[in-house]
Amino acid sequence: LGATAALATAITRAFFDFFERDLTDKELLYFANFSENITHGRASGIDVATVNSELPLWFIKNEPMEQIELNFSGFLVIGDTGVHGFTSQAISIVRERICEEKEKTMHQISKLGLLAASSKEFLMSNQLPELGNVMNEAHDILTHLGVSHPRLNAMVKTALANGALGAKLTGS
């Protein structure tokens, strides 16, 4: 959810404030990404860009990030399982699935891309039931890909049992 990017941004701003130096957006992104690379190895820069953006960002690999305006009257609730996950582990699991069942896994990955595109439209047009359905379907696919966790699945089940329109896992 960008916690380390937010911390890197705050620390960078604090240092520049302490030394009474002006900080350009370019410098802020440079130093915050530098910190992220130390923390994560090879960070994408997405989290730093997101925490420093006035609007949500839409990201597709190898395309420029796009700021999007939300028209959203619902609530998003974020829960933490306490389980530490690593993107690199999830990637390894999916790579293994591709080796084992290439056609099926690639279809699931493609479907996740289509669901993500739909979610963008639903967020921008306040289509909450449709967004919930997309989240549920995406979580099911991610579970079948092997990147979920029993605690996550229990939280999703609890959220849905208590009136949530949708629920899915996200990164840490």
What are these regions (language model features)?
Residues 2-6, 43, 106:
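Short, conserved micro-motifs enriched in small and acidic residues
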Residues 2-21:
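DPxDG-like acidic metal-binding loop motif
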